[in-house]
Amino acid sequence: MIPMEELKVKKITNGTVIDHIDAGKALMVFKVLNVPKETSVMIAINVPSKKKGKKDILKIEGIELKKEDVDKISLISPDVTINIIRNGKVVEKLKPQIPDEIEGTLKCTNPNCITNKEKVRGKFKIESKNPLKIRCYYCEKFLNEVIFE
């Protein structure tokens, strides 16, 4: 049997590294960020982690996340660490927190909600962070799944 070689992923010079993503959720995180298609992205899925057993990692060259993006990530995988990289150095480490309220970003799962019938931006209250329970401000229904706009 041929021994497996360790695959090393190149460091990024400027951009964002999202580490400690729950295993199997990197593609979901990538999708909600709407990264331009010409952007260099590295995704590692189910890599060994001392803290979690397995984790995913996402490296995005040339893009620093906005607060709205960080909020989205916190709803998918709340224990991530986000590192902002400039000139090859970590200049900022972010530990996202699930916000108490969310405006926009999410879509109500109730087909009868006003947000699904008219041009009204969704507004939501986080009732519980663990387990995650989100209530629509307008129809007061709990979301049965997280759907991003």
Swiss-Prot record:
A GO term from the CC aspect: aspartate carbamoyltransferase complex
Cofactor note (record): Binds 1 zinc ion per subunit.
GO molecular function (one): metal ion binding
Keyword Chloroplast carried by entry: no
Cofactor(s) it depends on: Zn(2+)
UniProtKB keywords: Metal-binding, Pyrimidine biosynthesis, Zinc
Residues annotated as binding Zn(2+): 108, 113, 136, 139
Functional description taken from the UniProt entry: Involved in allosteric regulation of aspartate carbamoyltransferase.
NCBIfam families: ATCase_reg
Subunit text: Heterododecamer (2C3:3R2) of six catalytic PyrB chains organized as two trimers (C3), and six regulatory PyrI chains organized as three dimers (R2).
Protein name, as recorded: Aspartate carbamoyltransferase regulatory chain
Natural source organism: Methanocaldococcus jannaschii (strain ATCC 43067 / DSM 2661 / JAL-1 / JCM 10045 / NBRC 100440)
